[in-house]
A protein has these predicted regions:
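Charged, compositionally biased N-terminal leader segments and the immediate start
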Residues: 1-56
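A short, histidine- and acid-enriched strand-loop-helix "catalytic/donor-clamping" loop
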Residues: 63
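Alpha/beta enzyme core
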Residues: 41-55, 66-90, 100-150
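Short, hydrophobic beta-strand segments that form beta-sheet elements in well-ordered domains
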Residues: 95-97
C-alpha cells in the first residue's frame, strides 16, 4: 500500500518510515488468507477450552470520562462476583482503569488471579512533560498496578 503525501509537505518521521518501508500489502490477498484460515481451523477452535482461554486473556476495561471511585469499585465488584455467577469459566486476566484508580481497584479486588492494569503517561494523548508521565506511572505502580499500558 503506497502512502501518498502532498509534495509541498515535508514528511514527518512516521510518514518517512512508511515511504521507506519495503512491506507491501494487498487487501484482497489478506482477506483470502483470513477466509482460508477460518475454513481450515474454525471447527477445531469452536470449543469451551478455547473460549475459556480467550476470556482469560481479556483486560476488562473502564476508561470512561465519567469514571469515579464509586463506579470503579462497582466495576471491580463485578469481577469479584464473576465466579459466583459463572463458576465454569476462568476469570478475566486484568481490570484496566485510569492510573488514578489503581488504588481503588487494589482496595476492592478480592480475587487473587486478576491483575490490575492501568493506562498511564497522560493517556490517551500522551501530551505531557516526560517528568509528569514518569511520576504518574510510578504513582500507579505504588498504588498497586501490576501492568502499565502507555
Amino acid at each position: 500500500m503506497e502512502q501518498k503525501f502532498d509534495s509541498k509537505e515535508t514528511p514527518n518521521k512516521y510518514q518517512q518510515a512508511f515511504l521507506e518501508s519495503k512491506v507491501e500489502t494487498n487487501d484482497a490477498v489478506v482477506a483470502a488468507e483470513v477466509e482460508k484460515i477460518l475454513k481450515e481451523h474454525i471447527a477445531e477452535n469452536d470449543n469451551k477450552e478455547v473460549y475459556q482461554f480467550l476470556l482469560n486473556c481479556v483486560d476488562l476495561t473502564t476508561l470512561s470520562t465519567t469514571d469515579s471511585e464509586r463506579s470503579v469499585a462497582a466495576f471491580t465488584k463485578k469481577v469479584n462476583d464473576y465466579w459466583t455467577n459463572y463458576p465454569q469459566y476462568k476469570n478475566v486476566a486484568a481490570i484496566c482503569v485510569y492510573s488514578n484508580f489503581a488504588e481503588v481497584v487494589r482496595g476492592a479486588l478480592e480475587v487473587s488471579d486478576v491483575n490490575i492494569a492501568v493506562c498511564s503517561a497522560a493517556f490517551p494523548s500522551s501530551q505531557a512533560h516526560i517528568e509528569t508521565k514518569v511520576a504518574e506511572t510510578a504513582l500507579a505502580i505504588e498504588d498497586g498496578a501490576d501492568e502499565v499500558d502507555i
